[in-house]
Design a protein with these regions (language model features):
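The DNA-contacting recognition helix of HTH DNA-binding domains
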Residues: 18, 33, 117, 142, ...
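Short amphipathic alpha-helical boundary/capping segments
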Residues: 10-12, 105-113
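Short, small-hydrophobic-rich alpha-helical interface motif
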Residues: 21, 25, 36-47, 66, ...
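Short, charged helix-capping/linker segments at alpha-helix termini
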Residues: 2-12, 22-42, 50-58
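Arg/Lys-rich amphipathic alpha helix in sigma70-family domain 2
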Residues: 65-86, 99
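A short pre-motif secondary-structure segment
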Residues: 120-124
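Short helix-coil-helix linker/hinge
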Residues: 100, 110-118
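DNA-recognition helix of helix-turn-helix
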Residues: 138-163
Length: 169
């Protein structure tokens, strides 16, 4: 029963990686749960279609690449539309308690960063991918990942500094 084995293997993959995909999608969409679920569904659909080819190589990197590409495609196609920010967009890891106000500030700041740069930050710092893995997911050179990371961090610093100055007034 070859189809059954494929379905079983795919189901096991989804059970193991869906949370990570959803976390990445939530970060990319700055907390828009519905858009994040759409991205994850798109990624998992493509993973399933190509399962025979990719499951031995590792479906995770492929799924994350599809997820990021779907996000970037959506941003290119769509006219600027309001971004929704939900309280549970960031699910802090077990590194300790994180102030909800700080998370909201970071989420809002991420909205002001170009989608490609936001994707680099999410993959590098929230998904803990190294430069080479990030380059594979984004289908670009390692140098591009490094330069986009530097530009994104500078932009994030500028936005956060501006927000802090506004709050102090």
């Amino acid at each position: 029963m070859p189809g059954g084995d494929r379905d079983h293997e795919f189901r096991e993959y989804v059970l193991g990686d869906r949370t990570r995909l959803m976390r990445t999608a939530m970060l990319l969409t700055a907390g828009d749960r519905y858009a994040a679920e759409d991205l994850v569904q798109t990624a998992l659909t493509k993973v399933y279609v190509h399962w025979r080819r990719i499951h031995h190589e590792g479906a995770g990197p492929y799924a994350h690449r599809v997820l990021v590409n779907a996000f970037l495609d959506d941003r290119r196609r769509a006219a600027r539309r309001p971004e929704l920010i939900s309280a549970d967009a960031f699910e802090p890891r077990s590194h300790g308690e994180v102030d909800a106000a700080d998370l909201l500030t970071v989420r809002k700041a991420l909205l002001e960063i170009a989608p490609r740069q936001r994707a680099v930050l999410v993959l590098r710092y929230f998904q803990d991918l190294d430069v080479a893995e990030c380059a594979r997911v984004l289908e670009c050179s390692e140098g591009t990942v490094k330069s986009q990371t530097a530009k994104a961090l500078k932009r994030l610093r500028d936005v956060m500094t501006d927000r802090a100055a506004e709050g102090a007034e």
